Amino acid sequence: MASGRRAPRTGLLELRAGAGSGAGGERWQRVLLSLAEDVLTVSPADGDPGPEPGAPREQEPAQLNGAAEPGAGPPQLPEALLLQRRRVTVRKADAGGLGISIKGGRENKMPILISKIFKGLAADQTEALFVGDAILSVNGEDLSSATHDEAVQVLKKTGKEVVLEVKYMKDVSPYFKNSTGGTSVGWDSPPASPLQRQPSSPGPTPRNFSEAKHMSLKMAYVSKRCTPNDPEPRYLEICSADGQDTLFLRAKDEASARSWATAIQAQVNTLTPRVKDELQALLAATSTAGSQDIKQIGWLTEQLPSGGTAPTLALLTEKELLLYLSLPETREALSRPARTAPLIATRLVHSGPSKGSVPYDAELSFALRTGTRHGVDTHLFSVESPQELAAWTRQLVDGCHRAAEGVQEVSTACTWNGRPCSLSVHIDKGFTLWAAEPGAARAVLLRQPFEKLQMSSDDGASLLFLDFGGAEGEIQLDLHSCPKTIVFIIHSFLSAKVTRLGLLA
């Protein structure tokens, strides 16, 4: 009986394996990538290292994807592949068919075997079929007991898209010559902490490995990239949630890289609700966070002041944006984010394709500014899809408004005309200035609604200027510290009020 577990997607890519001798200074090794429901497996595959970026590309040896030359043997495939039933989708061109030859059949007491894969045709373009693969089914039709002629007829009747379920049958292919084993290659060298990359840099040189390696897809980071020597975005960077394992892969072209990135991210996304539930339980157990709900979680790529980038795990609650270097899996780790941005003092100032004033070259980027007692913190992030950008944009804007509606009022000590005072800003009642002399009664010195505020500004050091018009004109308040936090909160209150009015209009 067939298992309900979906057959993994497999294909050949190239893994950055270390320093090379060419102009690009990098060595690449062909590997078999296998994507299952919750794990990504990388196995060493046959074949010489691929060309470095910018170098002329040589004709690929026929045995990389099948024995297309007479007498050539199939690749020495990794043990991981020998144990797998794989489902491969082949999309046929208008001419040329599947581009395979088959042998075997019930009359020969053998399964239906792929004996030849023709270079450049549909099967070869999948990079996931191999000479020696047994075809178990075609579009769901069982071929396990088919004769050779029956299999030929089934394959001939297929449409433009053909789903083949296959399994590599090394033991029943004695007439195929084994090719020599591939060189060893590595992937699991821990990156520097925090995870940082120079612009378009693939990360540290990995250690060698000679057998399959497995990376959990639980909250893994997936990013499409290019390199200084090859501007085509056909590279993938994949990091484990704990930041200890990093893969830097090269696909044959941009379309292939995009397809793999989409498929891997889709599997990561299916695991995200479970991660969110686990973090929600940890968050509820912390004494400082209370019972805040997690509104959004995901990896962002942050532009660093040095010019590099870093994977940053962002966790958005009802009140804060918490940024981590890796997935927090304990209460202690969750309570110690690398940075925290209170939403009420945070503004989304850019979302979408970068502009000339924004020093970031990503098409899908957004910028946040947070008012603090030390000034304004600015952070630039990018995401991998328009859907992610839309989700983060909406959640951040809505989060700012929720925080404003939840807080309602803030107060700060200040000095006005030499008198010690207290400034209260309420989302509905507006601005109230109270006398705060020691021993004196708490008297209202000034009260103005938001509707009267014509302009606000600050000097970036300690002074806040509020212009309500009328007889008072502009008032000057000395907050005795950087006024940016209160300025950003005033803007959040105003934005929330405008949104509230828009919803009621």
Curated annotation (Swiss-Prot):
GO terms for biological process: muscle contraction; regulation of heart rate; regulation of sodium ion transmembrane transport; regulation of ventricular cardiac muscle cell membrane repolarization; ventricular cardiac muscle cell action potential. Residues 6-269, 293-401 form the PH domain. GO terms for molecular function: actin binding; ATPase binding; calmodulin binding; nitric-oxide synthase binding; PDZ domain binding; sodium channel regulator activity; structural molecule activity; transmembrane transporter binding. One of its GO terms (cellular component) is plasma membrane. Residues 87-170 form the PDZ domain. Disulfide bonds: none annotated. It holds the Pfam family PH_17. Residues 483-505 are annotated as: Calmodulin-binding. Residues 1-25, 40-77, 180-210 are annotated as: Disordered. It is a peripheral membrane protein. High expression in skeletal muscle and heart. Low expression in brain, pancreas, liver, kidney and lung. Not detected in placenta. Keywords: Actin-binding, Calcium, Calmodulin-binding, Cell junction, Cell membrane, Cytoplasm, Cytoskeleton, Disease variant, Long QT syndrome, Membrane, Phosphoprotein, Repeat. Residues 449-505 form the SU domain. Signal peptide: none annotated. Phosphorylated by CaM-kinase II. Phosphorylation may inhibit the interaction with DMD. The PH 1 domain mediates the oligomerization in a calcium dependent manner, and the association with the phosphatidylinositol 4,5-bisphosphate. It is linked to Long QT syndrome 12: A heart disorder characterized by a prolonged QT interval on the ECG and polymorphic ventricular arrhythmias. They cause syncope and sudden death in response to exercise or emotional stress, and can present with a sentinel event of sudden cardiac death in infancy. Adapter protein that binds to and probably organizes the subcellular localization of a variety of membrane proteins. May link various receptors to the actin cytoskeleton and the extracellular matrix via the dystrophin glycoprotein complex. Plays an important role in synapse formation and in the organization of UTRN and acetylcholine receptors at the neuromuscular synapse. Binds to phosphatidylinositol 4,5-bisphosphate. Monomer and homodimer. Interacts with the other members of the syntrophin family SNTB1 and SNTB2; SGCG and SGCA of the dystrophin glycoprotein complex; NOS1; GRB2; the sodium channel proteins SCN4A and SCN5A; F-actin and calmodulin. Interacts with dystrophin protein DMD and related proteins DTNA and UTRN and with MAPK12, TGFA and GA. Interacts with MYOC; regulates muscle hypertrophy. Interacts with DTNB. This is Alpha-1-syntrophin. It comes from Homo sapiens. The lineage of its organism: Eukaryota, Metazoa, Chordata, Craniata, Vertebrata.
